[in-house]
């Protein structure tokens, strides 16, 4: 989702996959919730698909709940497709020294999973 925030990082608008984005602040899909608030929304929206970007977050914002962002300014790559997964791996190879990763360190483990 794409969002707009105020000066205190409180989300004012959240739109999932907009045709014409109003900002370049994108959700990484990682959320932290107060348990009671989340359970309340899951119960309220139980007959929907319960997609966080389409239902839960926009509903909370619409009801003036306090929803904030944490701006992450390092490398992040959506790896939801084979092409983007390949691109992320190529980025790792190209930028390993830049980010302080030694790919030739025998003690550094790389974990991956398919399916």
Q: Which residues does each predicted region cover?
A:
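Conserved core of the sugar-phosphate nucleotidyltransferase
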Residues: 1-36, 43-45
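Left-handed beta-helix
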Residues: 36-37, 43-115
């Amino acid at each position: 989702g794409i969002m707009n925030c105020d000066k205190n990082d409180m989300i004012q608008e959240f739109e999932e996959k907009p045709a014409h984005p109003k900002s370049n602040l994108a959700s990484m899909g990682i959320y932290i919730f107060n348990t009671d608030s989340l359970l309340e929304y899951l119960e309220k929206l139980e007959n929907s698909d319960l997609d966080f970007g389409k239902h839960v977050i926009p509903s909370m914002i619409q009801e003036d709940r306090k929803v904030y962002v944490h701006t992450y300014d390092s490398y992040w790559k959506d790896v939801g497709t084979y092409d983007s997964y390949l691109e992320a791996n190529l980025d790792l190879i190209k930028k390993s020294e830049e980010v302080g990763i030694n790919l030739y360190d025998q003690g550094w483990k790389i974990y991956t999973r398919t399916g």
